[in-house]
From Swiss-Prot:
Pfam families: TMEM70. This is Transmembrane protein 186. Residues 100-101 are mitochondrial intermembrane. Residues 1-78, 123-212 are mitochondrial matrix. GO terms for cellular component: mitochondrial inner membrane; mitochondrion. The gene is TMEM186. Part of the mitochondrial complex I assembly/MCIA complex that comprises at least the core subunits TMEM126B, NDUFAF1, ECSIT and ACAD9 and complement subunits such as COA1 and TMEM186. Interacts with MT-ND3. It comes from Bos taurus. Its main location: mitochondrion. The chain crosses the membrane at residues 79-99, 102-122.
Amino acid sequence: MAAVLRAVARSPGPAAWGRPLHRLCCCGGQDPRRWVGSGPPHSKEKPLGPETEKFQMVYRFDAIKAFGYLSRLKVAQTALTVAALPPGLYCYSQGLMPFSSLCLAGGVAGFALAMLCWMSHFFRRLVGILYVNEEGTVLRVAHLTFWGRRQDTYCPVADVIPMTESPDRPQELFMRIQQYSGKQTFYLTLRYGRVLDQERFTQVFGVLDALK
């Protein structure tokens, strides 16, 4: 037992055990601490795109919020109307509702669906706000979604057809914003909307009689 204790006392400590590895790393010209918890560097730079550019507001239609609330109300009303059809069918099968009332409920539900489709088609193309980037090359259109919420669409200014080439007149209730590519058409009203930056607006859509 005494011999074993003397052998343990003479053996190198834990600090000496790591010296060969330390010498190996140092001979390689590398710091061993670099390998502890290190990993490949991650780039924090975001890719450049329209979302990262600065835009200037050039047009605003203040009533777009009211149209958004109206769109949500119409979706809720249509959902309730359609949800009332299954109970109506059950009542008719049990003889609790005449056939004429069932037809009336079905007609109301069909009319509500048709109105929702028409209103959604128009509201999703109604322009609430127009922005132009500082270089004047990108047009950002803020409009509504099917659910009455805001959505931004980016269009190259070079693809936008000037309103001076459109058959629509500024005195009309709505004017169309069209693209040469034919991707999407929007509607804006100069009668009830406000042009906030006339210079940038005319750079995109041309000089209109209503803005002179």
